Design a protein with these regions (language model features):
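Subset of outer-membrane beta-barrel
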Residues: 34-324
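Cleavable N-terminal export/targeting peptides
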Residues: 1-36, 307-324
Length: 324
C-alpha cells in the first residue's frame, strides 16, 4: 500500500517552499482544493456550512459523520464531524443554538475547528427566515517527524512539530418554506492568518456557501424526490455539488438513496435508512481528477433527533423518526 505522506513529502522536498506549501500541497492531492472539508451528504451537516441552520428543526438534532480519504493510501487519514443543535423559544421569539467540531487529519497534517453557533428565527412569507452567527477556534498542526524524506536535514521538515491556532467567525442566512429551503453564508469572516512555528504561516481565505433544496411529491404519497445543490467559493476555487435523492416512507420503513456530482471533483452515490430513530447512511465518492476514481472517499453518517419539551413539566423527551 502506497504511503500518501511519502508521496506528498517527495513533491514538497523538490520544491522546498516551506510549511505553507506543505499544507497547500496535501489538500490539493486529496482533492480538497478549498480550506474546508467537503462532505457528500452536505445537507446532514448544514451547521458546518451555515450557522443560521441551527434550530431550523423542532428537535434536538445530533449528527456524526466520518469520511475516509484516498482509498488505497495508508496515510490518507479521515475527516470527522460531530454536531448538535436545538431550537428554543423565549416568549414569542424562536432561537437556535449549536456546537460543532471538525477534525481533519491526513498523515502528518491536522486541522481542527470548534464552533459555537446562534441563530434567530423569524416568520416571513409563509416560511421562516433565520440569521445566524458563530465563533470558531481554528487549529493547525504539522508533524514533521512523520515525514519520510531522502534528506534528513531537509529545511521543510527539520523543524519538527509546527502548530498554531486562531479565532474566526462566520455569519449566514437561511430561509425554510414548506417544500423548499435556501441558505447563504460567509465563512472565515476574519480571514485569519495562522502562524505555524516561528517562520511559517497559513492564510485562510473567506469562503461563501450557497445551498438550496426542493421536495418534489410524486403520485405515490410514499415517494419523494429531493434535488439539492451546494456551491462553495473561496475567492479562487468554485465547487458545486449537485444531488438527486429519492426517499421512501411507507409500511413503517424509511429508506433513501441518491447520487451526487461535483464537476471537476467527484461523482458519488449513497444509501441510507432510519432504524429505531437512528438515521444511518453510507456513501462512496469517486474522484474524477487528482488521485483518480479508485482512490475515492468512504463516508458514513449517523443522525438522531430527540423531541424536547423545554419548560413543560410532566412530559419526557422522546425520539423522532422524521426525515433528517
Amino acid at each position: 500500500m502506497r504511503s500518501l505522506v511519502s508521496y506528498i513529502a517527495s513533491c514538497v522536498q523538490r520544491c522546498r517552499y516551506g510549511a505553507l506549501l506543505v499544507v497547500m500541497c496535501f489538500r490539493a492531492v486529496v482533492v480538497f482544493a478549498q480550506y474546508d472539508a467537503a462532505f457528500m451528504r452536505y445537507w446532514q451537516v448544514e451547521p458546518m456550512l451555515n450557522p443560521a441552520a441551527v434550530g431550523r428543526q423542532e428537535e434536538l438534532n445530533v449528527c456524526v459523520a466520518l469520511q475516509t480519504h484516498a482509498t488505497g493510501y495508508e496515510d490518507a487519514g479521515s475527516t470527522l464531524y460531530a454536531g448538535a443543535d436545538m431550537a428554543f423559544a423565549i416568549g414569542r421569539t424562536r432561537h437556535g443554538v449549536g456546537l460543532t467540531l471538525v477534525n481533519d487529519e491526513i498523515g502528518l497534517f491536522s486541522h481542527k475547528r470548534f464552533s459555537a453557533q446562534y441563530a434567530y428565527h423569524h416568520p416571513l412569507w409563509g416560511g421562516k427566515l433565520a440569521a445566524g452567527a458563530q465563533v470558531d477556534m481554528l487549529s493547525e498542526s504539522v508533524d514533521g517527524g512523520k515525514a519520510q524524506t531522502n534528506d534528513a536535514n531537509d529545511p521543510v521538515f527539520s523543524g519538527g512539530d509546527m502548530s498554531g491556532s486562531q479565532f474566526d467567525a462566520s455569519v449566514g442566512l437561511f430561509y425554510t418554506h414548506r417544500r423548499w429551503y435556501a441558505g447563504l453564508a460567509m465563512q472565515h469572516l476574519t480571514a485569519p492568518t495562522i502562524s505555524l512555528g516561528d517562520k511559517s504561516e497559513l492564510k485562510v481565505n473567506s469562503a461563501y456557501n450557497f445551498m438550496a433544496g426542493y421536495n418534489i411529491p410524486t403520485k405515490y404519497s410514499f415517494i419523494t424526490l429531493t434535488p439539492s445543490i451546494l456551491v462553495r467559493y473561496d475567492g479562487t476555487d468554485v465547487r458545486a455539488d449537485l444531488t438527486a435523492r429519492i426517499k421512501y416512507d411507507g409500511e413503517g420503513r424509511k429508506l433513501y438513496g441518491g447520487v451526487n456530482y461535483a464537476p471537476q471533483y467527484s461523482i458519488g452515490a449513497f444509501f441510507g435508512f432510519v432504524f429505531h430513530g437512528l438515521d444511518i447512511c453510507y456513501g462512496y465518492e469517486a474522484n474524477t481528477n487528482g488521485l483518480g476514481i479508485s482512490a475515492g472517499n468512504h463516508e458514513v453518517t449517523l443522525g438522531y433527533k430527540v423531541e424536547l419539551n423545554l419548560g413543560k413539566r410532566g412530559r419526557n423527551a422522546h425520539k423522532s423518526v422524521r426525515w433528517l
